[in-house]
Amino acid sequence: MHTMLKKDFWYDLPKELIAQEPAAPRDAARLMVLSQKDDSIQHKVFRDLPEFLEPGDLLVVNNSKVLPARIVGVKQPTGAVCELLLLRQVKGDQWECLAKPGKRMQSGTKVSFGDGSLTAVVDETMEDGNKYVTFYYDTETLYEKLDEFGKMPLPPYITKQLEDQSQYQTVYAKELGSAAAPTAGLHFTPELMDTLRAMGVGIAEVTLHVGLGTFRPVQEDEISDHKMHSEWYSISEETARRIRETKAAGHRVIAVGTTSCRTLEAAAAKYGEIKACSGNTSIFLYPGVKFNCIDGLITNFHLPESTLIMLVSALYGYEKTMHAYEVAVAEKYRFFSFGDAMLIL
């Protein structure tokens, strides 16, 4: 296979096709259905998903919940305004954060948020400029304070404020720790999930805490040189068993989102099968890399030259993926986190 370059994954996207808010209701988003068997493209609506699934199929969703991790505070005693974005828990109440203005927040800097019932102290600055910060609060959990003072860390291309923070959570989100939503799951409603279960489609959960590295552009010209960011994942005993049983019975395992996909493929690559496990993964799926677990994928339309469009190309084929994206632009699909979905089966 020839060396793949970043520019191979470029496509032209008119700005107005970048969705600024989610579809309402959630399952009213459009769904492009791509067949791996005959290369056909169908244009549907997300709530039509049951038409393409069969009893025995297993959907694997990522139950990670987004932290309202962007908090604006004032430095003590100067009163200068600053912002922290919590990236990941280091230990206890110490978090790795992105700080603005970073240069002015050296170790020992104290910051106060809201009514002062949440404070933070900068412990140290890392090589990449990120800070280790310890938080102090008067509630049982830090999350209660973030809920009170924090905002959702929306991707940079979404400029509209959310009417409701829950619009950026999946309906099944429960494990706190993501810096961005696993967006393919935003299209599911409780009713649609009930319909799927009633027809014999299984729904199993994994956890992968999405890091902001998700939005980090690929810098290298040759994509195989790109180093992926690391993210924490976990697969339970029950989910592992259901996946093994689905495969053994000859049914399909369909990942809901690139994060579920990467979780399953990381575990399969590491252990040779899916078993209960947790750890960090920096798996990078791009054309030429073999898939060992999933049979299908539900995902949104991703940024040009992103690792996510590379993942889709790895599963569906490079030429076919880029063609599908051209069709999506021509058909005026909505793109990125709040946009429409694609089903590859």
Task: Go through each PLM region and give its residues.
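Surface-exposed, charge/polar-rich loops and edge strands
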Residues: 2-345
